[in-house]
């Protein structure tokens, strides 16, 4: 039973619970009208302390399509946070108004702190450079729907692997499925954090390699996960300018990829995937965004005990 659980990290749920969510998401995709009122009378609070378009709108659309309602803020300056209110007090107050919280925060561990003061489920919609579990559910559902299997894949992850919370969450989740291999493509400065390398990959004897060449990595992968170099994570903007265009996936590079390779991206993109790739049948990132809405519908319905 997922009712009243928090989702702060992919490891909070078992593989069986993932499958439960994916099964419901698939059913909703196939017959959305059947689920359009199951959360009637329920309220989602979206507390976004960091800018977001896709994740916030995906959560809001998901709740509205389930028949529920949405309250919240999209930047801290429009809330009592700007007056100095603590996270603890914000969460305890929102508990009086809502049935469920989706929260994004720039500080790692903020969602965990929020859950300590909440009697209603808290969903981590991204905490700094740490984790982004609903993006992971989105990624897994997309792979499952279009590849058919979450096991036995060679996944190349490219770009900002140091600060990229979507990358950290995805590695953590896919490492729980059998025979997956990882190719980690990044500049030396943006390599995967040690805790991911040591506590997840090496501890579980998962095959991986770290390289700097996208052209080399793309040859072996059947899933390519592109990420942007994140301007907001850099203190030194000259360093960002130096690294921002180091990886650009274009039509020429796609010619070196497998015919059945899947290209994913958590979005937003900047320059790392050229628009010409959008027309390639291997580009799945907009289908991925749609899967995100359905998987959030399934997740919220489960946490609220409505499905």
Curated annotation (Swiss-Prot):
Positions contributing to carbamoyl phosphate binding: 54-55, 104, 132, 135, 267-268
N-terminal signal peptide: none
Reaction it catalyzes: carbamoyl phosphate + L-aspartate = N-carbamoyl-L-aspartate + phosphate + H(+)
Alphabetical keyword list: Pyrimidine biosynthesis, Transferase
Binding site for L-aspartate: 83, 165, 228
Cystines in this chain: none
Role of this protein: Catalyzes the condensation of carbamoyl phosphate and aspartate to form carbamoyl aspartate and inorganic phosphate, the committed step in the de novo pyrimidine nucleotide biosynthesis pathway.
HAMAP family, per database record: Asp_carb_tr (MF_00001)
Protein name: Aspartate carbamoyltransferase catalytic subunit
Gene: pyrB
């Amino acid at each position: 039973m997922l009712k009243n659980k928090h989702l702060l990290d992919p490891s909070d749920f078992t593989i069986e619970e993932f499958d439960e969510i994916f099964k419901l998401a698939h059913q909703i995709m196939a017959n959305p009208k059947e689920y359009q009122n199951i959360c009637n009378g329920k309220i989602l609070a979206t507390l976004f302390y960091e800018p977001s378009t896709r994740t916030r709108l995906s959560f809001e659309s998901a709740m509205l399509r389930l028949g529920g309602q949405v309250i919240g803020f999209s930047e801290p300056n429009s809330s009592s946070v700007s007056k100095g209110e603590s996270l603890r007090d914000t969460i305890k107050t929102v508990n009086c108004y809502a049935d469920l919280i989706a929260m994004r925060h720039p500080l790692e561990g903020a969602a965990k702190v929020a859950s300590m003061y909440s009697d209603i489920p808290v969903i981590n919609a991204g905490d700094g450079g740490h984790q982004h579990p609903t993006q992971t559910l989105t990624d897994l559902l997309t792979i499952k729907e279009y590849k058919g299997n979450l096991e036995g894949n060679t996944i190349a992850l490219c770009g900002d692997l140091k600060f990229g919370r979507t990358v950290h969450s995805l590695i953590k989740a896919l490492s729980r499925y059998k025979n997956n291999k990882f190719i980690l493509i990044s500049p030396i400065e943006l390599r995967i954090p040690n805790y991911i390398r040591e506590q997840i990959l090496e501890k579980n004897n998962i095959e991986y390699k770290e390289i700097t060449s996208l052209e080399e990595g793309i040859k072996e992968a059947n899933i390519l996960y592109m990420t942007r170099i994140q301007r907001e994570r850099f203190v030194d903007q000259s360093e960002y300018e130096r690294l921002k265009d180091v990886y650009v996936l274009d039509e020429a590079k796609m010619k070196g990829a497998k015919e059945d390779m899947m290209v994913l991206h958590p979005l937003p993109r900047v320059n790392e995937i050229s628009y010409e790739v959008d027309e390639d049948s291997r580009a799945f990132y907009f289908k991925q965004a749609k899967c995100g809405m359905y998987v959030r519908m399934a997740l919220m319905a489960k946490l609220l005990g409505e499905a």
